[in-house]
Amino acid sequence: SQYIGPAGEVLYFNSETGDRGKSNLPLPGDDVGRTNIVILASKNLGKTMAIYRAAFGLGQGFVMPTPNKLVAEAQGLEAGAMFRLGFITLRERGNAIHFDEYTDSSAPRQAAKGMLPQACAMVSFNVDNLDAVDADFVADPITEYGGMRSAVFKGPAGELVELIEADR
């Protein structure tokens, strides 16, 4: 389900109401679980997906055209406007990156100098080995989070991606 939040953000919620054994959703830790799909908007879907596939060693994923009423409304387009959507699954069950290709009618998010843009500006992922990730980090990795190394890179759409080296 899609909802507009109090700051105008688009929130997606999913729930498991069927057979848990057949579901691809991760098990929640409580009544509300954790993020399992992150959404990245980009003006060049193919390039953006290719960068993530290379950086994380991900599979091909898929791309399909689809209508999205909320995105169309936010961009001042007709409700039936078609958008290209991409989807790449991650290692853990039910986790994925969902890519939306925005049209030229969408404006870049504005940010004050030295500040993050409005809405989601950063996401974190666990990785096995920071040194194996093909990314230009904004600074050398640091040790935090109880002794785990982490580093941040700037993605192709201007997003910040924190990688945390974690044992699984």
Predicted features and spans:
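Vicinal oxygen chelate
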Residues: 1-33, 39-40, 60-90, 94-101, ...
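Amphipathic alpha-helical segments
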Residues: 44-60, 132-134
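Eukaryotic modular interaction domains in large regulatory/scaffold proteins
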Residues: 105-107
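Low-complexity, glycine/alanine/valine/leucine- and proline-rich hydrophobic stretches
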Residues: 119-126
